[in-house]
Amino acid sequence: MSKGPAVGIDLGTTYSCVGVFQHGKVEIIANDQGNRTTPSYVAFTDTERLIGDAAKNQVAMNPTNTVFDAKRLIGRRFDDAVVQSDMKHWPFMVVNDAGRPKVQVEYKGETKSFYPEEVSSMVLTKMKEIAEAYLGKTVTNAVVTVPAYFNDSQRQATKDAGTIAGLNVLRIINEPTAAAIAYGLDKKVGAERNVLIFDLGGGTFDVSILTIEDGIFEVKSTAGDTHLGGEDFDNRMVNHFIAEFKRKHKKDISENKRAVRRLRTACERAKRTLSSSTQASIEIDSLYEGIDFYTSITRARFEELNADLFRGTLDPVEKALRDAKLDKSQIHDIVLVGGSTRIPKIQKLLQDFFNGKELNKSINPDEAVAYGAAVQAAILSGDKSENVQDLLLLDVTPLSLGIETAGGVMTVLIKRNTTIPTKQTQTFTTYSDNQPGVLIQVYEGERAMTKDNNLLGKFELTGIPPAPRGVPQIEVTFDIDANGILNVSAVDKSTGKENKITITNDKGRLSKEDIERMVQEAEKYKAEDEKQRDKVSSKNSLESYAFNMKATVEDEKLQGKINDEDKQKILDKCNEIINWLDKNQTAEKEEFEHQQKELEKVCNPIITKLYQSAGGMPGGMPGGFPGGGAPPSGGASSGPTIEEVD
């Protein structure tokens, strides 16, 4: 295949989306199911690996081996409080591998474990394939988005996931920045505008404030709640109906995973309906112990169930405004991102908060981030079209960065929300007389003491000549590149001795070897998936051949045209094959092909004889001639294949 354009991928917690900039506009690409967003789900079964819709659709039957929310694990340590609390809610197992979390599943009868990067890489591979199927070209270059609050290690791990998926990640950019780009292209403005991005997705909520002036974006502040989103609204509805079921039928379905799962799916559908209608009905046959559950819910009741959650979305809005030192009257534009912003009540709360200001909903909220990422991909890969020429992108550091100084104090060199790339230098000195070296410990976080912040890495600068305290001058430089990767260096001014560290954050980092290995494994899994597809198609081909053959000889139009002995011979062989199929669903492709040859050996001579004696086929035979499904392995076209008879 020829080389395709660069794409933009929104790798979401619950859903992902891919877009491409071509013919002067962005196209959001639908998957093979016709959906423009794809669930970030990967499932493992005894026979295959499923990604996307196929994985999400079978979650009820296979909950422990269906992995989602990899984004909540990526770039984190196993003992991270977030990982520990999230684990309680996941049906799949998370295990500790030398301090790093891995998800453990049963796949093809074996226990397998995968790093979050590997799971995310499977979703990215799926997004890559969706784009390739649409473009008819290979896709390698991509811009991938992450939440604004992602730290260095999470960004780096996301980049690694791209590498494992065989992508060249041009840049990792913040989701609100991407949404702003999508929006910035739509409405070019001269004077400086303050834009608030309200992103309420499936599992997370982020508020960001940006200023846009002459095509230049600057992120002023970010706030949010990593655990608020559409799924929480679904849960409220699920609990409401579990209680209703208890009242009506005196039975508690909450312990029955499958019943709850079916109820949740129905609730998600009802929630979407309630964004456009004021009432939604739910009908689930045989939900629990044979009881059908037919009920309905009004929009008002849905809003009441979620009243505190909906109202709570305004707190991060206020915090973001405070951080950006802006009053709400100074916000020029409000941009909605994320499927949950379609909920009318949320739109109303937000609009009322901003004193009736119109909200920008022109870009489909599920697609805005991928849309902007696609534009950014076009810019970075050198698209020269008018539309993208005058766009500049400034991202920010999500958390303050600094070093520990005497007494465990956090001394900040780069404040949070600083536009990157950036470089800051500060001079430090020794704390005691004749101190031979200093330990530079790099932290990220907003607390005054380093013990409450997050240690990114440390290194020593030794060989400082003996001197009284306060005399040596040690210059510490923090340098962040456009991808948010941090370099910290320290130089002793008197000797010129230098030491430095690149924080690509080992607390969640994979080594080069790990990544290489995972790239290979990803290839292997892909090959296995291919093999599985071939196997299924040869099985289906054999099955349809056998059933068609049976139908053909049993057709009354053939009465008297085929002798009973021949007919019985074919029926016996067909039934034998059908029985064999029932017992050997998981046989190898070659076995199915062999069985098909055996069947053809019996059928073809009889059918040929029939054909000749009839002077052409009798008209209107059911299903035409057998050999439906994929052509048998003889490389023949469909229809009967003729072979030498032994």
Curated annotation (Swiss-Prot):
The modification N6,N6,N6-trimethyllysine is found at residue 561. ADP binds at residues 14-15, 202, 268, 271, 275, 339. ATP binds at residues 12-15, 71, 202-204, 268-275, 339-342. Signal peptide: none annotated. The modification N-acetylserine is found at residue 2. GO terms for molecular function: ATP binding; ATP hydrolysis activity; ATP-dependent protein disaggregase activity; ATP-dependent protein folding chaperone; C3HC4-type RING finger domain binding; cadherin binding; enzyme binding; G protein-coupled receptor binding. Ubiquitous. Residues 2-386 are annotated as: Nucleotide-binding domain (NBD). The keyword GTP-binding does not apply. There is a cross-link at residue 512 (Glycyl lysine isopeptide (Lys-Gly) (interchain with G-Cter in SUMO2)). Keywords: Acetylation, ATP-binding, Autophagy, Cell membrane, Chaperone, Cytoplasm, Host-virus interaction, Hydrolase, Isopeptide bond, Lysosome, Membrane, Methylation, mRNA processing, mRNA splicing, Nucleotide-binding, Nucleus, Phosphoprotein, Repressor, Spliceosome, Stress response, Transcription, Transcription regulation, Ubl conjugation. Residues 614-646 are annotated as: Disordered. Its main location: cytoplasm. It comes from the Eukaryota. Residues 616-632 have a biased composition (Gly residues). Induction: Constitutively synthesized. The modification N6,N6-dimethyllysine is found at residue 561. Molecular chaperone implicated in a wide variety of cellular processes, including protection of the proteome from stress, folding and transport of newly synthesized polypeptides, chaperone-mediated autophagy, activation of proteolysis of misfolded proteins, formation and dissociation of protein complexes, and antigen presentation. Plays a pivotal role in the protein quality control system, ensuring the correct folding of proteins, the re-folding of misfolded proteins and controlling the targeting of proteins for subsequent degradation. This is Heat shock cognate 71 kDa protein.
